[in-house]
Curated annotation (Swiss-Prot):
UniProt record similarity statement: Belongs to the ABC transporter superfamily.
Name of protein: Uncharacterized ABC transporter ATP-binding protein MJ1023
Species per Swiss-Prot/TrEMBL record: Methanocaldococcus jannaschii (strain ATCC 43067 / DSM 2661 / JAL-1 / JCM 10045 / NBRC 100440) (Methanococcus jannaschii)
Lineage of source species: Archaea, Methanobacteriati, Methanobacteriota, Methanomada group, Methanococci
Gene3D superfamilies: P-loop containing nucleotide triphosphate hydrolases (3.40.50.300)
PANTHER family: ABC TRANSPORTER ATP-BINDING PROTEIN, ABC TRANSPORTER ATP-BINDING PROTEIN NATA
């Protein structure tokens, strides 16, 4: 299968500072791919290169498909109405008027902000402004959706809403590549990840192949409810010893060990 995104030995300098150091990865159709790392790891620079915003670099970058991009810096026309901003970006993408109108209504309803259609951007909460910015990235029905820190500034309810929408995009065959520095956001979302440290790729592959296997277990111990997350092997022993008293057993994966030296 031909990858939707192919990157080989990507290197980028800002002045004398090397911010990306020969990173390589591939992303396939219908995949949710994550870039994970602390601030300054090189995530945003990588996504800006994929989106065509940064053009000067060394290495090979191939992107096969129409792109939608949610930047880390949320920049919308604050004095404009939501509907006018979305119309502008739809027109910029070459959409017909009927397509734009239909897409606007669909996404405003999907993200539960249809009541703000005629509100000015500056009148919206930061969370709702971010939802509008997300719509900008998908209004033109792109093949590839690039999301830089998509959950930043959202409350728990809206994080879940956006996660569900990302999963739906995947089911439609869209390719999604997103960045985050929050482990819990990526462990249960991405099919594969690239973990960056100071511009270098330190791990690349499926979550279960690069993470420490853990388990969350709830059980009764002499009538007392115990809840804890422990290494998988330890949890299995408890499960065997207290099978009748185990209330919940859930396999999880931890990436924490990868960041201990940061």
């Amino acid at each position: 299968m031909k990858p939707k995104i192919k990157v080989e030995n990507l290197t980028k300098y800002f002045g004398d500072k090397k911010v990306l150091d020969e990173i390589s990865f591939e992303v396939y159709e219908g995949e949710i791919f994550g870039l994970l790392g602390h601030n300054g790891a090189g995530k945003t620079t990588t996504l800006r290169i994929l989106a065509g915003i940064i053009e000067e670099y060394t290495g090979y970058v191939e992107v096969n498909g129409k792109i939608g991009y949610l930047p880390e810096e949320r920049g919308l026309y604050r004095d404009e109405k939501v509907v006018d901003v979305l119309k502008f970006f739809g027109e910029l993408a070459g959409m017909k008027k009927e397509e734009i109108a239909k897409s606007i209504d669909y996404w405003l309803n999907k993200l539960k902000i249809s009541n703000y259609k005629y509100s000015k951007i500056k009148e919206l909460s930061k969370g709702n402004q971010q939802k509008v910015q997300f719509i900008v990235s998908v209004i033109h029905n792109p093949d590839i959706v690039i999301l830089d820190e998509p959950f930043s500034g959202l409350d728990v309810v809206n994080v879940r809403l956006l996660r569900d929408i990302i999963f739906e995009l995947k089911e439609e065959g869209k390719t999604i590549i997103l960045s985050t520095h929050q482990l819990e956001k990526i462990e249960r979302l991405c099919d594969r990840v690239l973990i960056l440290k100071k511009g270098k790729a330190v791990h690349y592959g499926k979550i279960e192949d690069i993470c420490r296997k853990m388990a969350y277990i709830e059980y009764l111990d002499n009538g007392k409810l115990i809840k804890k997350e422990i290494p998988y092997e330890e949890a299995v022993l408890i499960l065997k010893e207290k099978a009748e008293d185990v209330i919940k057993f859930e396999v999880r994966y931890s990436l924490e060990d990868l960041f201990l030296d940061e």
